[in-house]
Amino acid sequence: SSPRVRWVEMRGVIEKGRTDQPIRGYGTLLDITDRKATEHAMERLAFYDSLTGLPNRTNGMMLAQQMLDQARQAGVAVAVLFVDFDRFKEINDTHGHIVGDNVLSELAARFRSACAKNDVFARVGGDEFMCAYKLAPGEDPLERAKQLQHALGLPVVFDSLKFEVGASIGVALFPEHGDSVEDLLKHADIAMYDIKGRGGGSLLFNEALGLKLERRISLGAKLAHALAHSQLQLHYQPKVHLATGTLCGVEALSRWCDEEGQWISPAEFIPVAEERGLINELGDWTLTQAARDIRYWQEAGAAVVPRV
């Protein structure tokens, strides 16, 4: 059989004679191999993802911060990539988590292979991954993102099923976009979220993206307040029969004027309602308000049927 390494803990004392010279020693040897194995397993659980074997968020953030500290001393730039798979939720919802886990494991292996030896990479969320690496002078920070997209965009085959997942990737640069891993990952996440909403791809962070996110968050809070306090309005656009010139109906349109007196375009607040989970509440309010208006018109003798 092949030799096996074992860990031992040695404790002992030295007995000295009258001249203070050692004359004998005695002690114990304790086999601690099992204890070391347990410690190693606990370390793996604490710092590595059990499904993919990649460093977890805690470990990845720590390693990336060490890279930033080294880059700061050397005066070099670091790129931080935030990777999110585009259609992974559909796989879990349609085929279950066993299939989803196998697909994710394959994608994680590709992700690891596409990263260079000295890169820091980790799984930071359900289907979210990060990669940090030092930029060479003149290197395009989006080039690595494109390489990752190519590797992750190839079909994954599992149990005779073929899945095309793909990835959206946001990129932030040290020191231009932040001085800590937390800030860089947040900014890369913002860039990823923006490009994902536009159909996927890769995007370098800029300050305008941060302002755009702040406005979206602010609008979400204001919209929730407006719905709770019935501050939206229904405007009705008439439909006229061209041959007779008579009114044949109206189209109900949701409109919102915020507390500062600014009209918010439906093209802006409806996507926010979808993101914040308010779209059903908005629909309920629209139908309720339209029903009230129909009743009012009927009581006034008008026979107008709105299209909501």
Predicted features along the sequence, with ranges:
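Conserved long alpha-helical elements within nucleotide-processing catalytic cores of c-di-GMP signaling
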Residues: 36, 43-47, 53-79, 86-116, ...
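PAS-family sensory domains
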Residues: 21-31
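Cyclic nucleotide signaling catalytic output domains
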Residues: 121, 147, 151, 157, ...
